[in-house]
Amino acid sequence: MHCPFCRHPDSRVVDSRETDEGQAIRRRRSCPECGRRFTTVETAVLAVVKRSGVTEPFSREKVIRGVRRSCQGRQVDDDALNLLAQQVEDAVRATGSAEVPSHEVGLAILGPLRELDEVAYLRFASVYRSFSSAEDFEREIQALRAHREVPAQS
């Protein structure tokens, strides 16, 4: 790794620690040339494969933007959206794959969104699952009600 101060092409790792709940590694480095220290953070790149075949990096911001549209007019704050995006990223990373189809990202959004706000969930699901009739909404509402009743019976 190049030193950001003197551009020397090598550096020595002084300390390494996991951060971000094991999703990243923070390394403290020292430059043998100028002696200055600096920190780097390493994360595994997670790519999303779109339907068209195009690959792009996973983006929490993109998840938040998509979910925010579904939450318009609802009492959902930014902290809740950030937490949802983190849950989605954790679920997608848990697959162990470096490349994940966009379809799986959508599936990973549905669960946490259902728990966050049912109306936003219905809005998102209607687009994600391409609802084309009132019956599609009715089926999804029935599934929501059934999901609500299952934990109560436990």
From Swiss-Prot:
Cofactor: Zn(2+)
Zinc finger residue ranges, unnamed: 3-34
Cofactor note: Binds 1 zinc ion.
InterPro entries, per the entry: ATP-cone_dom, NrdR-like_N, RNR_NrdR-like
GO biological process: negative regulation of DNA-templated transcription
Top-level taxon of origin: Bacteria
ATP-cone domain boundaries: 46-136
Any GO molecular function: ATP binding
Protein family (similarity comment): Belongs to the NrdR family.
Known role: Negatively regulates transcription of bacterial ribonucleotide reductase nrd genes and operons by binding to NrdR-boxes.
Name of the protein: Transcriptional repressor NrdR
Originating organism: Mycolicibacterium vanbaalenii (strain DSM 7251 / JCM 13017 / BCRC 16820 / KCTC 9966 / NRRL B-24157 / PYR-1) (Mycobacterium vanbaalenii)
